[in-house]
Regions:
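Non-Sec secretion/translocation targeting segments of pathogen effectors
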Residues: 1-9, 221-225
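Catalytic glycan-binding domains that act on GlcNAc-containing polysaccharides
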Residues: 5-6, 10-187, 191
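Low-complexity, Gly/Ser/Thr/Pro-rich intrinsically disordered linker/tail segments
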Residues: 175, 179-225
């Protein structure tokens, strides 16, 4: 019966599978996630690492939850670990759901969790990058467990390769994003100037001219967040 239902309601996988293999194929949302992760981590010298982890764990924000871990967010933070470190609540289903939803909804909180975890291991492993990444993935467990060490080693190699690729692509993303933002702000400023001009012209027609803005009074247009 179950097989019949699944067959009759087959999921169009081609429509839900995101492109995760190469950053040049990322969509706009994925590029923004990668840039966000990079900018958040770059203040601590871990920008490319944060971006690589976001790419590795969630396909740059496309797959935000793993029920088997359970983990969630753009970096797939381990939910029980987040509950233990950042709350005083018991690890029960309701709290897991709440924290999971928070990690998926709030990229800043998810980034805080990921960066603090990396910084903890950076200190603990005395700056050994390979051990930092292996420990980020498996904690201390890889040290005395061959299977977990093999898994942690593979994770490190994945992150290392992604960092190398992102060193080529993130500067391009940043330049394209900044150009796009510049054009957007210029358009907004031009629209505001046009609106002010229309108001001035309208008031002139009503013989109630608008007071001219002195040259010393500069207009600054704050970009929207």
């Amino acid at each position: 019966m179950i097989h019949t239902l699944l067959a009759s309601a087959s999921i169009p996988l081609d429509k839900i599978q995101a492109k995760c293999g190469d950053p040049k194929d990322f969509n706009t949302k994925q590029k923004k996630v990668i840039l966000y992760a990079y900018n958040y981590g770059s203040t601590k010298g871990l920008g490319y690492t944060m971006a690589a982890i976001a790419w590795q764990e969630s396909c740059a924000g496309e797959y935000m939850v793993n029920f088997s871990d359970p983990s969630a967010g753009i970096y797939h933070a381990h939910i029980p670990g987040v509950i233990k470190k950042y709350t005083k609540y018991k690890d029960v289903s309701f709290v897991r759901n709440f924290i999971g939803e928070l990690l998926m909804r709030d990229n800043e909180f998810a980034s805080k969790v990921a960066l603090e975890n990396l910084l903890f291991w950076q200190k603990n492993r005395k700056g050994n990058y390979k051990e930092i990444i292996k420990s980020y993935n498996k904690g201390f467990s890889w040290e005395k467990n061959k299977s977990k060490n093999k898994s942690a080693e593979a994770y490190y190699q994945d992150i290392r390769m992604k960092v190398l690729k992102l060193r080529s692509y993130i500067p391009k993303y940043t330049k394209a994003y900044n150009n796009s933002l510049k054009i957007e702000l210029e358009d907004k400023n031009q629209n505001i100037k046009n609106t002010l001009k229309d108001i001035q012209d309208s008031r002139k027609q009503q013989k109630n001219p608008i007071k001219k803005i002195e040259s010393k009074d500069k207009i600054f247009i704050m970009p929207e967040p």
